[in-house]
């Protein structure tokens, strides 16, 4: 009986040692991360995994006689991702469990955006620029845009999303993608990028079109938001290209702003379409936003004028 118990103890210890050794060597062959399980999950995704998540889907209906229907757009995906990251930052100290739920969704949507980005290279001023850009997988007949069109507002939103993912995780991979995204604003629209040179009084100005084409409608609100988000990225990272693009964007806003003045109202684009109430309200907020950012009185002037 005593011999039996001794045997059982020795067997138990032997098995325990085997488990420890096996676990040590198997574990040593796997990447070790100090981050929380949510971040580990996205660093080690399992191929062919089906995620049961809600994707933001936009219903466009029929535009100019063309049925667009339901579409998953990079613009609305990045908007939803940003909301998740903001929730994560707000809750991570007060409610870590709930915060991780938002982090997981934000990272999932960010990874989706990365998977949908097109990586391209264009020659600009005898230099090759590699960039990523997001496209819309449907026609947009309102501005005669073919399937595969792109826009600066969407691009800047994806840029902001990538930076938030980097801020939340510290993963340099997201910052690297953000740097590729900013490069698209250095490449002319004609070469697949999001830079349009707009001429006024024989001078050249940078414009980042919300609806990119060789002859864009020059929508004001999208250009302002894109410029400010580019500047935000530049200020947070020190990216010299972003800071330069921001400076040029502000110069263009100030130059062309009077052309969008309809008296007591504002124009949506350079084609003379008056804003609806939603975009009129947005223009006023943007004037206040620009004034607070720059201290330039011209923005306060238009805020007060359009507010009356």
UniProtKB/Swiss-Prot annotation:
A GO BP entry: carbohydrate metabolic process
InterPro entries: 6-hairpin_glycosidase_sf (IPR008928), C5-epim_C (IPR010598), C5-epimerase (IPR039721)
GO MF assignments: heparosan-N-sulfate-glucuronate 5-epimerase activity
Leader peptide range in chain numbering: 1-28
Cross-referenced Pfam families: C5-epim_C (PF06662)
Segments traversing the membrane: none
The entry's keywords: Signal
PANTHER family: D-GLUCURONYL C5-EPIMERASE (PTHR13174:SF3)
Name the record gives this protein: Uncharacterized protein MJ1128
Lineage: Archaea, Methanobacteriati, Methanobacteriota, Methanomada group, Methanococci
């Amino acid at each position: 009986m005593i011999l039996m118990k001794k045997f059982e103890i020795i067997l138990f210890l032997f098995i325990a040692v085997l488990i420890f050794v096996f676990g040590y060597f198997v574990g040593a062959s796997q990447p070790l991360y100090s981050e929380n399980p949510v971040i580990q999950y996205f660093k080690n995704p399992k191929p062919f995994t089906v995620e049961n998540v809600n994707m933001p889907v936009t219903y466009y209906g029929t535009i100019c006689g063309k049925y667009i229907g339901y579409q998953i757009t990079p613009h609305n995906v990045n908007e939803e991702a940003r909301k998740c990251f903001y929730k994560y930052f707000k809750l991570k100290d007060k409610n870590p469990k709930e915060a991780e739920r938002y982090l997981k969704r934000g990272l999932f949507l960010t990874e989706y955006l990365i998977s949908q980005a097109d990586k391209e290279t264009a020659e600009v001023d005898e230099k090759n620029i590699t960039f990523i850009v997001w496209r819309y997988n449907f026609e947009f007949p309102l501005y005669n845009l073919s399937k595969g069109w792109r826009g600066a507002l969407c691009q800047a939103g994806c840029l902001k999303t990538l930076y938030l993912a980097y801020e939340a995780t510290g993963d340099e991979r997201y910052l690297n993608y953000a740097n590729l995204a900013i490069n698209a604003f250095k490449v002319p629209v004609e070469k697949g990028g999001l830079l349009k040179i707009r001429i006024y009084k024989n001078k050249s100005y940078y414009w980042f079109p919300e609806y990119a084409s060789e002859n864009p409608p020059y929508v004001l609100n999208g250009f302002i938001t894109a410029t400010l988000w580019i500047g935000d990225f530049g200020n947070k990272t020190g990216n010299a290209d972003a800071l330069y693009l921001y400076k040029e964007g502000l110069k263009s806003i100030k130059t062309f702003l009077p052309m969008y003045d309809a008296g007591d109202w504002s124009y949506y684009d350079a084609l003379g379409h008056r804003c609806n109430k939603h975009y009129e309200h947005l223009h006023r907020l943007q004037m206040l936003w620009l004034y607070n950012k720059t201290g330039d009185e011209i923005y306060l002037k238009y805020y007060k004028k359009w507010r009356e």
